Amino acid sequence: MYAKVYQYKFPGISEAKVAAAYCSDKLGQKIDEHNFHGLGILISQEGDLTIWIKFDDVAKLKAFNKDADQFVHDLKTSFVFKENKYVGIYVYNY
């Protein structure tokens, strides 16, 4: 199992809520196209937004990366935030 994880820090929870709705819409449209195994979007009270997208194999993750660049670009032109992203392999998942 592979995952693409985005971590964003917004000025406050209000901005994170708006961004979460935007991300839910944009990424939700990509579920069938890229055959996501899972999609999770979390918000903290401090304005953190975490998005994880699970893939069954690395080929699907690499195929999504092409669309991911446009998604991140659109997000950056619409919102102010700090970004941390990485690709990981699930070591343990229940």
List each language-model region with its residue ranges.
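C-terminal structural segments of small proteins and small subunits
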Residues: 71-85
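Short S/T/G/P-rich N-terminal loop/turn motif that feeds into the first structured element of a domain
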Residues: 1-49, 54-67, 83-94
